[in-house]
């Protein structure tokens, strides 16, 4: 008996059938993967029920929801516009944030992205009068760009992803259809790292080198900042970022998105270069803000 007699005709399988087969295979593989490597709570490591669901156990999820129950405006330590966050960087929040950033728990992105989306919603509501100002919006009326904070090439290589980019995408997805504006995340393959020489001598875009990681990129050799003081962070960030495609943001309304706001040095530099490129920065949104004398 040949394959056609058994009811299988490879030449006649429709795209719809192939799609259903692929979906079934993906679900089957996901189920097998979960059987071999059961899911656990990202915060307390307790085993989670089989099947899809939050990346936190019921108790930790309740604590997370309490921590992010109400958005708030914070006073940044740098010259940045209005900043809206969903929580303070304490309690359960650091464990969730670091789980997503450093432990590969990208299954936490939906929870964090939802928190970020609520911040974006509040900021947009506060600036809703700007959407009717054609002189500001021009040809791109009723569209707001979510600009994720950049990750260094070394951190992207280590993690395999850029945290703020994942969160901005998730926030945009959750807000789709709920707002009078369409939100989109700027493509992430058009800006690289500014060379040290271009920072020192004001080099042109042609001097830019390094890995393409997002609309904005940190200067090469930037390294980690978390051990630096607020003043040191500000000095280190000045001139570190470049918008390499100014035409993509000129005359556009932008919101800067990040996972955690510490001193505001990164946000301040993003505001500077985006404004120089001609964009209108409405503000900064983040999942959490770090209290003074604390560091993520």
Positions of predicted regions on the chain:
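Glycine-rich phosphate/pyrophosphate-handling loop used in enzymes and phosphotransfer proteins
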Residues: 1-296
């Amino acid at each position: 008996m040949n394959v056609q007699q058994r009811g299988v005709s490879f030449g006649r399988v429709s795209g719809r059938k192939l799609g259903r087969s692929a979906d079934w295979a993906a679900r089957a593989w996901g189920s097998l993967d979960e059987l071999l490597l059961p899911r656990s709570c990202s915060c307390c490591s307790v085993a989670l029920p089989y099947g899809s669901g939050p990346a936190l156990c019921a108790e930790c999820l309740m604590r997370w929801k309490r921590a992010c129950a109400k958005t708030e405006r914070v006073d940044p330590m740098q010259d940045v516009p209005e900043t809206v966050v969903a929580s303070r960087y304490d309690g359960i929040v650091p464990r969730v944030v670091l789980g997503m950033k450093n432990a590969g728990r990208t299954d936490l992105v939906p929870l964090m992205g939802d928190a970020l989306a609520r911040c974006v919603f509040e900021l947009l509501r506060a600036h809703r009068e700007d959407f009717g100002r054609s002189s500001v919006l021009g040809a791109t009326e009723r569209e707001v760009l979510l600009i994720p904070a950049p990750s260094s090439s070394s951190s992207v290589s280590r993690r395999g992803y850029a945290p703020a980019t994942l969160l901005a995408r998730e926030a945009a997805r959750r807000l789709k259809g709920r707002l009078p504006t369409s939100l989109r995340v700027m493509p992430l393959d058009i800006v690289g790292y500014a060379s040290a020489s271009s920072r020192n001598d004001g080099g042109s875009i042609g001097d830019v080198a390094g890995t393409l990681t997002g609309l904005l990129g940190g200067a090469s050799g930037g390294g980690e900042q978390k051990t630096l003081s607020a003043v040191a962070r500000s000095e280190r960030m000045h001139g570190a970022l470049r918008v390499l495609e100014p035409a993509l943001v000129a005359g556009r309304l932008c919101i800067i998105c990040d996972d955690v706001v510490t001193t505001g040095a990164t946000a301040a530099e993003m505001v500077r270069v985006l404004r120089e490129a001609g964009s209108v920065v409405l503000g900064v949104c983040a999942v959490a803000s770090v209290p003074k004398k604390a560091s993520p």
